[in-house]
């Protein structure tokens, strides 16, 4: 008895909670509810003939046309727009038996899915397929009231909607601009890398040429020093020999003068004169040979002096060339320092690029994980579709039996037809759940894409 009492209390508590929720919904419906004439007038204003009598005794085709107009106005969706997707779904599910679900019913089911999403946004959370096929006055008044109030609210917020739409367009344009700037930065980075490689080759060539010029400069300096030493030695030898020549010339003149003085004395003794003459001839020959040798030596020294003058000019040209080479070396050193600074800047940017590549690899791994998750969702959807296919096969068998027994079991066939409709509704719910899962996966992918673009933006700021 105590157990039954607790169950009774729980049932009454649940019933009271349900009654309070129902009462709150009724109050909301009463606030949103519009008169029949106002609803009919609003529908007439959109271009569809409609009266209060049509609302009291609704025609499903007319009601579907009104719903289709509202869906086209608010969502740009009609039966024709959902036909390709429903046809593809029918081909996947029904396979070789596309006539199981008629075309009109199929399109109406797809339109119902889109319309129910609109109704949930409008506040009608209990919208069913029966509201399209078998509408009632109370349901239509509630649904149309919510729809019309939603349209009025939307028209009053047109400026805000346009503002958010413009912000979205600006964001898309900004994303495209940033993407193009990223491409340009990557191209500039590649060009800088190519120019770095080209500059490295030029720097190596200039360093090699610089080393060759340094070696040649050192060799020319050594040659200059040797030539200068030889020139100094030759000049000293020339001065010494000129002094000797002048001394011997002076001695020869003095000797001649002495000969002239001694000539009268020599005339007195022929023998002594002959001997003196012989001696003087020998001395003269020796002096003459020495003078010829000295003249030859002087000519040789003059030739050497001219040669040294030419060599001195060459040395001056070499010195000028060395000065030019030193200027070129200074320029090369400046270019080398500039190239080193550029190389450091490029290495720093290379480090930034490596960091970006690491970030990109991390994002690629995250993207791969999300792709795997999406693939798992697709496999799950495929499994559910296979289950639905098996269920459809069962329904075909049931339909075949119903056709055979239609004449004698009309009432049983009606009950089975209702069961088939319920099964189709479950299939539609299942398809909607699959679409919701795919939509959520797509939203996750968009979030991941926005994160990637954010990282790219941060990378561009760093660059």
Curated annotation (Swiss-Prot):
Residues 166-455 form a coiled coil. GO terms for molecular function: microtubule binding; protein-containing complex binding. Pfam families: Nuf2 (PF03800), Nuf2_DHR10-like (PF18595). Residues 1-26, 331-354 are annotated as: Disordered. Belongs to the NUF2 family. Residues 1-14 have a biased composition (Polar residues). GO terms for biological process: attachment of mitotic spindle microtubules to kinetochore; cell division; kinetochore organization; meiotic chromosome segregation; mitotic spindle organization. Component of the NDC80 complex, which consists of at least ndc80, nuf2 and spc24. The keyword Cell division applies. Its main location: nucleus. The lineage of its organism: Eukaryota, Fungi, Dikarya, Ascomycota, Pezizomycotina. This is Probable kinetochore protein nuf2. It is found in: Nucleus; Chromosome, Centromere, Kinetochore. It comes from Aspergillus fumigatus (strain ATCC MYA-4609 / CBS 101355 / FGSC A1100 / Af293). One of its GO terms (cellular component) is Ndc80 complex.
């Amino acid at each position: 008895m105590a157990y039954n009492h607790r169950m009774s209390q729980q049932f009454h508590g649940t019933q009271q909670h349900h009654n309070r929720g129902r009462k709150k919904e009724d109050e909301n419906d009463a606030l949103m509810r519009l008169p029949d004439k106002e609803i009919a007038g609003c529908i007439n204003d959109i271009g569809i003939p409609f009266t209060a009598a049509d609302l009291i005794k609704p025609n499903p085709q007319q009601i579907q046309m009104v719903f289709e107009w509202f869906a086209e106005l608010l969502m740009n969706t009609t039966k024709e727009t959902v036909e390709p997707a429903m046809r593809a779904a029918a081909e996947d599910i029904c396979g070789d038996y596309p006539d199981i679900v008629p075309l009109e019913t199929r399109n109406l089911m797809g339109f119902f899915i889109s319309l129910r999403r609109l109704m949930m946004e409008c506040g009608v959370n209990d919208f069913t397929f029966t509201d399209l096929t078998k509408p009632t006055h109370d349901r239509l008044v509630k649904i149309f009231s919510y729809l019309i109030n939603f349209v009025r609210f939307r028209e009053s917020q047109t400026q805000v909607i346009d503002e958010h739409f413009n912000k979205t367009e600006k964001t898309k344009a900004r994303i495209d601009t940033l993407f193009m700037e990223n491409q340009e930065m990557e191209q500039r980075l590649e060009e800088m890398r190519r120019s770095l490689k080209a500059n490295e080759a030029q720097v190596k060539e200039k360093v090699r040429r610089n080393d060759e010029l340094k070696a040649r400069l050192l060799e020319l300096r050594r040659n200059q020093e040797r030539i200068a030493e030889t020139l100094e030695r030759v000049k000293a030898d020339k001065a010494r020999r000129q002094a000797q020549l002048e001394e011997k010339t002076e001695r020869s003149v003095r000797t001649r003068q002495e000969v002239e003085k001694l000539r009268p004395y020599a005339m007195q003794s022929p023998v002594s004169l002959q001997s003196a003459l012989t001696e003087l001839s020998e001395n003269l020959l020796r002096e003459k040979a020495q003078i010829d040798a000295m003249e030859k030596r002087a000519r040789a020294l003059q030739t050497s002096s001219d040669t040294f003058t030419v060599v001195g000019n060459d040395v001056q040209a070499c010195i000028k060339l060395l000065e030019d080479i030193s200027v070129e070396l200074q320029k090369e050193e400046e270019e080398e320092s500039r190239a080193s600074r550029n190389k450091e800047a490029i290495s720093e940017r290379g480090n930034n690029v490596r960091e970006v590549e690491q970030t990109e690899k991390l994002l690629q791994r995250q993207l791969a994980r999300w792709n795997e998750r999406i693939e798992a969702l697709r496999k799950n959807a495929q499994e559910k579709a296979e289950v639905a296919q098996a269920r459809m096969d069962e329904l075909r068998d049931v339909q075949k039996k119903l056709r055979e027994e239609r004449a004698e079991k009309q009432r049983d066939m009606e009950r089975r037809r209702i069961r088939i409709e319920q099964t189709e509704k479950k299939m539609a719910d299942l398809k909607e759940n699959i679409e919701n899962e795919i939509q959520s996966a797509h939203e996750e992918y968009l979030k991941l894409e926005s994160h990637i673009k954010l990282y790219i933006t941060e990378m561009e700021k760093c660059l």
